[in-house]
Amino acid sequence: VGALPAISYDTDLGLGFGLIASVARFAPKFVPYRWRLELLLSANAKRAPGRGIEVPFHDDYLNMDFPGLAGDRLRITARVGFRKFANTGYYGFGNGSIAEEPWVGIDPETDLAAYQAARRYHRYDRIFPLLQFSARIRLWDRSTAEQRKRVEAFVGLHGDYNIIRPYPGSLLEQDIAAAKADTPEGETLADLLQGTDPHARLTVNGGAVFDTRDHEYTPTRGNFTELSVRAAPGVQLGLRYVGVTLSSAWYKALVGDWLSIAFRGVADVIAGDAPFYELARFGALTPRDGPGGGWSLRGVPRQRYAGKIKLIQNLELRSLFWRFSIGKSRFAVGAVAFLDAARIWADWRRTELGGVGIDGGSFKVGTGGGLRVRWGETFLVRFDAAYSPTERTSGFYVDVGHVF
């Protein structure tokens, strides 16, 4: 049993505050636990453009994890949640999309309203309650007490209801209007800019997982590979699409827990009429924002890049160098150095807007380092500072769990 203030920080979201609590029951022959519940009630506060404080992100959820069902062959996870993301990023599509700065030259002291509107040029408000369910079935298992060696299949459902609210004068508002024009540029935008009206969405997920990690939360040896498919039948607005993800993470101990190396490669592709916000996300088993943000390309703004084809790589050098106890609680402190890279394509064909290709440029890069604090066996907090030499932007992140 554990409960902590949910204190987090993200350059894009600001300071997070709230409560995170977890309850886990341990039992012999069940790794990592018999069951676990996690509750998060949180919001983020950030300095508003010009002056004042805004609350850009609100996140509540209850996670349920039952790994020991059907003779320890079935694992069921579920999440019920609600999110309000008032500064969701929208920069257009493709690897060559431009992050404009229309607020340059506007004095917030003399024209605060214009300055705040300009700072929201690449932002919109998204509100979505959600429900997730996933069942993982163990197909093959040769695990030992020291290390897993198993293959699992998973199936799941994800449902949400989305309300999209563009800010006046924002790029999203402009592109929604441009997508209605009977021009080549309008047709291109209309193909990519789907799902801007309120809508319900249902996706069916399925895939397989190969897991040889020595620890679920702080692995130093082994591999975790996901091959997954997510498909939406088009409940509303004709949002019918299929997404495929291949993600493989590798861990190698160099000097036990003292020094290890970790690498993840992700390829994510989408075909069909996906909602535009899905083009800035990847994965089915654990969906994440990216490329961009603290879970994919650190140092680059969240939702910075959007497209139907994504490649993401993460390399980390990890160390757990200090272990201690406070009462009956066990802690470990470590450090990480990392390098992230990503490349994206807007669509399967060459895509142009205004006669110019939007997929130019090379890989986007973020690099940095941070600290890790582990409490017990299932709770880890990370502190990461990052800089992107390709974007010339920086980020700082405090969150729960390794990036991969």
Where are the regions that the model predicts?
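Short loop/turn motifs that connect adjacent beta-strands in outer-membrane beta-barrel proteins
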Residues: V1, F26-W35, G68-I76, W140-E152, ...
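Transmembrane beta-barrel strands of outer-membrane/channel proteins
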Residues: I7-Y9, L19, W35-A45, I76-K84, ...
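Residue-level signature of outer-membrane beta-barrel architecture
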Residues: I7-Y9, V23-R25, F66-G68, F133-L139, ...
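Residues that define the transmembrane beta-barrel architecture of outer-membrane proteins
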Residues: L13-F17, A21, Y33, E54-D60, ...
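Outer-membrane beta-barrel translocator domains and adjoining extracellular loop/strand segments
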Residues: L19, G50-G52, T88-G96, R165-Q174, ...
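A subset of solvent-exposed loop/turn segments in beta-rich extracellular surface proteins, enriched
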Residues: I20-S134, L139-P184
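C-terminal outer-membrane beta-barrel translocator/porin domains of Gram-negative envelope proteins
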Residues: R47-P49, Y61, K180-D197, R201-F338, ...
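Outer-membrane beta-barrel "beta-signal"
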Residues: L371-V373, R392-F404
